[in-house]
Amino acid sequence: MKSWISRPVPQLPGRMPAVRIFDTAVGAYSTLDATGEQSLYVCGITPYDATHMGHAASYVAFDLLNRAWRDGGQRVAYVQNVTDVDDPLLERATATGVDWRDLAASQIELFQTDMAALNVLAPDHYVGAVESIPEIVPAIERLLHLGLAYRVTGTPGEPDGDVYYDVEAASKHSAEAKDAWTLGSVSGLSETEMLELFAERGGDPGRRGKRQALDPLLWRVARDGEPSWAGGELGSGRPGWHIECTVIAQKYLPAPFTVQGGGSDLIFPHHEMGAGHAYSLTGVPLARHFAHAGMVGLDGEKMSKSKGNLVLVSKLRAAGEEPAAIRLAILAHHYRTDWSWTEAGFAQAKTRLAEWRDALTMAPGESAATLIAEMRSELANDLNAPGALAAVDRWAVAAKQQAGAGSPMDQALVSDAVNALLGVEL
């Protein structure tokens, strides 16, 4: 599947120091050593209701990491998936009378257009679940052969043969096992907390025939009226959610890759189970670090499809709003915090953008180098975008207070820095 096209990123003098991020799996900050090679996997959308502000905030957050690495002279391998077949997509297609493939294609196109408008750097590989089924099937077959997956007898009216991952068996390792996954390794949650979230986030803890309530689906055998694909010894069907990302990451990235990213709602079960699948398949951890973006609400309320209060990037753009201002409104909040989109906050972002542009024409001589150093220091510290924005604010105030003409060299350098590090074009 093709990705969108990235805009050129200006090259700046000097380099970003090694980036420190908060690692969810260890509950502490970790420094990402500047080894020269970095790798990033960010879980993509299920293509319906794209692109809401929660989506946008998550991809802008990890775009900051991508940019910070590149500014530090690192080569970055970046992969993003798209879950282009899943229950929510099929349910929306049925409810609206649209073929699920057409719905997915239109929403993927809209998402990519929004990402390009927000100046999010494109992944090197943008990979759909459907196109990955030929690799997913043998991975599930291997888990069956290893005794880490099992088939479930169908309930009345349902077919036999759905395949589930055995989390208890997968959590058992020899004393020599290195960096072995066990249930809770990523999330750090109690079983009670896991059960609650599992039911809320696509799991089926009450499914009869499962060995453990938290066992996730690997393969759903074919049902009438649902799309299905050849599954070898699994029978016709379609993959579960978590195994898709594991297989895609293992195909395109080193093992372990540097950072697994996504929204905080993916910590459990998605990232937890994906990490388990990876270790079960290869004996190697999926990722070295796990980082997560906060949730976005609207005017203090949870933003959700069911409430119908989604703020869509495409609707803002259609109303004539500038994508750079949308991006600035997102960057005003630290990526790990939960926050709400408000009209007041968006107005502040538009004012800030205008003030930066006004100040650019008055850029004081030899001011750019200090600003770049301050921005890099903030972004290297757990991608502290609000701190970087505050540094530009201070520079803009000083620029407006100076007498005389601005420096063309510093004007160009500040413009390049705000673009390269924050993804905002002045």
Curated annotation (Swiss-Prot):
Binding site for Zn(2+): 43, 245, 270
UniProt keyword list: ATP-binding, Ligase, Metal-binding, Nucleotide-binding, Zinc
Pfam family, one: tRNA-synt_1e
Motif extent ('KMSKS' region): 302-306
A Gene Ontology BP annotation from the UniProt entry: cysteinyl-tRNA aminoacylation
Oligomeric form and interacting partners: Monomer.
Function: Catalyzes the ATP-dependent condensation of GlcN-Ins and L-cysteine to form L-Cys-GlcN-Ins.
Recorded family membership: Belongs to the class-I aminoacyl-tRNA synthetase family. MshC subfamily.
Protein name: L-cysteine:1D-myo-inositol 2-amino-2-deoxy-alpha-D-glucopyranoside ligase
Gene it is expressed from: mshC
